[in-house]
Amino acid sequence: DLHSFPTRRSSDLGNSHALAAVAGLPARRARPGRAGLLEIDPAFEDALLGIKQASHLHVLYWLHQAPRQTLRRPTPHDGVLRGVFATRSPQRPNPIGMAVAQRLRREGARLLVSGLDCLDGTPLIDIKPYLPQADCVPGATLAWQPAPAPVPAPAP
């Protein structure tokens, strides 16, 4: 029974705000590259010391409006039914979302970022710096995911 799983407790760090969001859609799905705001609770502002040294951040959040009972979902690319642990679906037993967001600027306890994939008002769980040498796995694949289009070379 999914409802008998133990519940973990954590402190919300604050909330995310999708700037110019389309109602009901995560910011990235609504408009790629849209800016978002991470509003950190003032009690955690000291934890932002040094954040300006990171160009990109892992942002973890609680997908508070996502159903938690779903264990299998069809994937959007091919419609094949898969377990949620094999997908990036927000519908999962512990609806934890993650995005790699570009840090644009810090204003006190607020971070302006680009690349959030969550609804306006989504509770923040954690923020970590993106480490290129540790977080990028060359050659990693997911067999059912279409290969990304090649990045064109810059014009001379």
Show where each model-derived region lies.
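Short coil-to-beta-strand transition motifs
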Residues: 4, 91-100
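Single conserved hydrophobic/aromatic residue that forms the stacking wall/gate
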Residues: 1-7
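Flexible glycine-rich active-site/ligand-binding loops centered on an Asp-His dyad
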Residues: 116-146
